[in-house]
Amino acid sequence: MQEAYVNINSIPTHIFTWGRWIEETITEKEIVICITGNPGLPGFYTEFAGTLQKELGDLPVWVIGHAGHDDPPEASIREVPQLSGNEELFNLDGQIRHKIAFIEKYVPSDVKIHLIGHSIGAWMILQLLENERIRSRIQKCYMLFPTVERMMESPNGWVFTKVAMPLYSVFGYIFFSFFNFLPVWLRLMLIQIYFLIFSIPRQFLGTALKYSKPSVAEKVVFLADDEMARVRGIQREIVEQNLDLLKFYYGTTDGWVPISYYDQLKKDYPKVDAQLDTKKIDHAFVLRHSQPMAVIVRDMIQQHRRV
């Protein structure tokens, strides 16, 4: 595994790679790129992506998070712009431009991309397919637990808009500022207690600590709020025009994407390649189900390799 912060659209962006670094010459004719969900900290995806690359063996796997969701170390000379006055860098449109810039800079035009999108990453993939320069490079898109429609109407969307956002608007900045005022050891201990309660592996402690920074949390919430406003009905024209490129994977216990969304997709597009999970994998699969999900995605990719 290799990792570094690289400037994409003038924003320091944390990139993780397995098999080949982004600045190395790519000799393979295919590559796997994973666009994260929200929060877009690629550190949550290390077990998933590492397992996937090991299972595939010969394909590089890269993970890119979202602009502003993972600040460089304090000693770094690179700084992420503040949210205020730079909203266009961190909303959905800004995140899409961010992904286009990354692909165009680091992926050679003759290399085909197996593009994984988790949660809102799947919605971003639909927007990327509108860009012919990107679309022409794609081998297949794997839409995992895809929040591509009616986010606000979902059970979790209702909780976010009716409960979480009002609370964050009043107490969010104060809470995160106070939390970050605490000594690091105490912050880690509190996060570890939370992890124990919800059975989250300790390996994500460092990533969760980054997530708790006020400058990161506000951008995560800002993007989520934009998702609620923008992700409404499914984008029928994009889906219809790209059915051959899309593979959907839906959960059965997903508060963001109820099974009814899967049923409606199958009804509206009888020929769509959509699969319903049988292993009770969570929406946030990277926290507890990285390895089984990596095996599932491996099988998907193997079916759609270039001949």
From Swiss-Prot:
SUPFAM superfamilies: alpha/beta-Hydrolases. Its main location: other. Its EC number is 3.1.1.13. Expressed in accessory glands. Residues 157-200 are annotated as: Potential amphipathic helix required for binding to lipid droplets. It catalyses: a cholesterol ester + H2O = cholesterol + a fatty acid + H(+). Disruption phenotype: Viable and fertile but displays phenotypes that appear to be the result of increased juvenile hormone (JH) and insulin/insulin-like growth factor (IIS) signaling. For example, under nutritional stress shows reduced male survival, sensitivity toward oxidative stress, decreased locomotor activity, altered cuticular hydrocarbon (CHC) composition and desiccation protection, increased nuclear foxo levels and larvae are unable to adjust their developmental timing to their nutritional condition. Six day old adults also display a significant reduction in triacylglycerol (TAG) storage levels. It is found in: Lipid droplet; Endoplasmic reticulum membrane. GO terms for biological process: lipid droplet organization; lipid storage; negative regulation of juvenile hormone metabolic process; regulation of lipid storage; triglyceride storage. Interacts with the juvenile hormone hydrolase enzymes Jheh1 and Jheh2. Also interacts with Hmu, Cpr, Gp93 and Pvr. Belongs to the AB hydrolase superfamily. LDAH family. 'Sturkopf' means 'stubborn person' in German. The name originates from mutant larvae which do not adjust their developmental timing to their nutritional conditions. This is Lipid droplet-associated hydrolase. It comes from Drosophila melanogaster (Fruit fly). The lineage of its organism: Eukaryota, Metazoa, Ecdysozoa, Arthropoda, Hexapoda.
